[in-house]
A protein has these predicted regions:
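Short, acidic/small-residue loops that bind anionic groups at enzyme active sites
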Residues: 3-4, 82-106, 113-115, 160-167
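Short, structured coil segments at secondary-structure junctions
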Residues: 34-35, 84-85, 154-155
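C-terminal non-catalytic interaction/assembly regions of soluble proteins
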Residues: 211, 215-317
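Short, ordered loop/turn segments at secondary-structure junctions
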Residues: 2-9, 43-44, 71-74, 92-98, ...
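Accessory alpha-helical/coil subdomains and C-terminal extensions
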Residues: 68-70, 76-80, 109-231
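Glycine-rich oxoanion-binding loops at beta->alpha junctions
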Residues: 10-68, 73-74, 105-118
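Short acidic, glycine/serine/threonine-rich loops at helix termini
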Residues: 11-16, 50-52, 77-82, 100-105, ...
Length: 317
């Protein structure tokens, strides 16, 4: 069975029947091509404040083992509940932020990445038509994986991520060099939603990237001031479009392999493990070890950052 809306379902003692054959009477499994979640998600309220009721709901439903499909924040909460209630818990990483430790893949990341790259492909044409700098703000919370991967794959000129400090002077110099040296009159900037203020503003606590319109607008305003309004910018905040859509083939394969191994672990009575993808196969790690290492940040000296620099992308100082 499935538990609808995570711990809310345990509170209300609700279950949803699941079948290997899917919901279609003709035997067509719609789940592979469905985005999001058929069970629903929960991201509000103080879950641990209702711990006793949740634990009672778990016992009332008589669950033998629980597979939690979640990102790092939800994993921390569900693990605390599992420890309190002595649950048999298996975790599967599912987040577009790609910030769960130890795993090279998380369900949803590849689909979101493809959505962003598709958006960049479309926005390049309007940027080129009007000789504009298009600033694309993407999700990622406190990590820059989505911005870094999509920026490289989409041919961005500037990528800004939380893990690498940057200067507005450096951005404007790069944009000017693109125009003067390479005669490129437009540019694409990919901005992660979790970036901090530029180095020029780092010592000024009164300045924040949390403007009414987000970090993309902060960068646009800084570029306008730096260039004396000679650089024409437009901001596109992709928002929740990144969290939906038809799952990519890679995400379908990853989810299927994670699911198979999760069931195998339950059959072997091996619990308190999170599944991870490393070196082309599914492996396991103790959940507590994963939580201790979360979130998984971009390595500023890593191969992807160095690849971006080698491609002539400005990615900070």
């Amino acid at each position: 069975v499935g538990i609808p809306y995570a711990t809310q379902g345990l509170l209300e003692r609700k279950t949803v029947p699941l079948s290997i054959h899917g919901w279609d009477l003709r035997g067509i499994d719609p789940l592979l091509s469905m985005g999001g979640t058929i069970l629903g998600s929960l991201s509000k309220g103080d879950t641990l404040a209702h711990a006793n009721e949740i634990l009672a709901g778990y016992q009332a439903i008589a669950i033998d083992a629980l597979i939690a499909i979640s990102g790092n924040g939800s994993l921390n909460i569900i693990h605390q509940l599992a420890v309190l209630g002595h649950w048999n818990l298996i975790a599967i990483p599912k987040t577009i932020d790609h910030d769960v430790a130890f795993t090279e893949r998380s369900i949803g990341f590849d689909t979101a990445l493809n959505t962003i790259v598709d958006a960049i492909n479309r926005l390049i044409f309007t940027a080129a038509s009007h000789d504009r700098v298009m600033i694309i703000e993407v999700m990622g919370r406190s990590t820059g994986h989505l911005a870094l991967y999509s920026g490289i794959a989409g041919g961005a000129d500037v990528i800004l991520i939380p893990e690498v400090p940057y200067t507005i002077r450096g951005i404007c110099h790069h944009l000017t060099e693109l125009r003067d040296r390479w005669q490129k009159k437009f540019a694409i900037i990919v901005v992660s939603e979790g970036i901090s203020t530029c180095l020029e503003d780092a010592n000024n606590p009164s300045i924040s990237t949390n403007t009414k319109y987000g970090q993309g607008q902060y960068i646009a305003e800084k570029i306008a001031n730096c260039s004396h309004h000679l650089i024409d910018t437009r901001v596109s905040v992709l928002g929740h479009i990144q969290r939906g859509g038809i799952p990519s083939a890679l995400d379908r394969l990853t989810a299927s392999m994670f699911g198979k191994v999760a069931v195998d672990l339950i059959a072997q009575n091996k619990y308190d493990q999170m599944l991870a993808w490393q070196n082309g196969k599914v492996v396991t790690f103790p959940i507590q070890d994963v939580i201790a290492k979360n979130p998984s940040l971009v390595n500023p000296q890593g191969d992807l950052v160095q690849t971006a620099r080698s491609l002539g992308i400005y990615i900070g100082e």
